[in-house]
């Protein structure tokens, strides 16, 4: 995602990992082979990038490397939705991380959103939390992936267990790329904890929220 690529690279470095960004089909399999984790981000999508995503994802599966999907904008166009669904069909993802609108689109196989942000009607609240948890667990069961739904309240779930995470700051949603940064961080956490996908994903979400809270404190006068 060219919009957020520099911020994501710096976030991965801050986690102690070493980022390399590539979307070229010619060398993507070679690049993927030297990495322990793959973060497929669907921002700035085009057919050439889809080809690279497919090649990189399949190579990572072959090598038993960690793979994360960030389905940016799924539901905002049929092109994006179809591309995301094809990726889920063809590649085994360790984690799928998105906002609630993107995840609902992928779980249902169709949907509409107003862009890369979650629709207001889809907002995860204390009132609909009990209904959403079984929905997310079922999507995890069907995909074999940990599902991370991020927003005001975060859910990180496999088919059996679900972490509900309430931290962070609402102001984080006003910064472009915080979700992309989290996906980069989460991929690093997965690569460092290969036997614990659920816990690694939840730890990344917690760390991002705590970082936001700490940053907010430093921004206050006095």
Region spans (language model):
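Conserved post-catalytic alpha-helical subdomain immediately downstream of the catalytic base
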Residues: 176, 185-222
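Short pre-catalytic strand/loop immediately N-terminal to key active-site residues, enriched for Gly-Thr
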Residues: 163-177
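Conserved N-terminal subdomain of the carbohydrate kinase-like
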Residues: 1-69
